[in-house]
Amino acid sequence: MYTDPIADYLTRVRNAVAANHKVVEIPASNLKKEITKILFDQGYILSYKFEQNTVQGSIKIALKYDKDTKEPVIKDIQRISKPGLRKYAGAAKLPRILNGLGIAIVSTSKGLMTGKQAKQLNVGGEVICYVY
């Protein structure tokens, strides 16, 4: 049993990218679905599909690679706020990742969103992870 399901999710994606897998299957939860939707909307993954094959269900994610160089689009994905040490940031303090080339995923009172969207709405929250 793992104590941090989001870290497990990010590690599965990171390992699949490192092994050049085309698809990764992850146990589902509402938070994981929202993170996956953000990754899709931002162009980091090709597609995703929710499957209700068990009580919990699973998410199948098709990873995205560059057509010419075959390099993965996701260079790194890092967990920031952890169960033992939560990291919060106000709207003004939300970080820019690699000068705007990456994204921060933030859990706000208005839902899960990118750091850029949170700044536009002037809301802060818990910084879940960085993707670049």
UniProtKB/Swiss-Prot annotation:
One of its GO terms (biological process) is translation. Keywords: Ribonucleoprotein, Ribosomal protein, RNA-binding, rRNA-binding. One of its GO terms (cellular component) is ribonucleoprotein complex. Disulfide bonds: none annotated. GO terms for molecular function: rRNA binding; structural constituent of ribosome. It comes from the Bacteria. Pfam families: Ribosomal_S8 (PF00410). One of the primary rRNA binding proteins, it binds directly to 16S rRNA central domain where it helps coordinate assembly of the platform of the 30S subunit. Belongs to the universal ribosomal protein uS8 family. Part of the 30S ribosomal subunit. Contacts proteins S5 and S12. This is Small ribosomal subunit protein uS8.
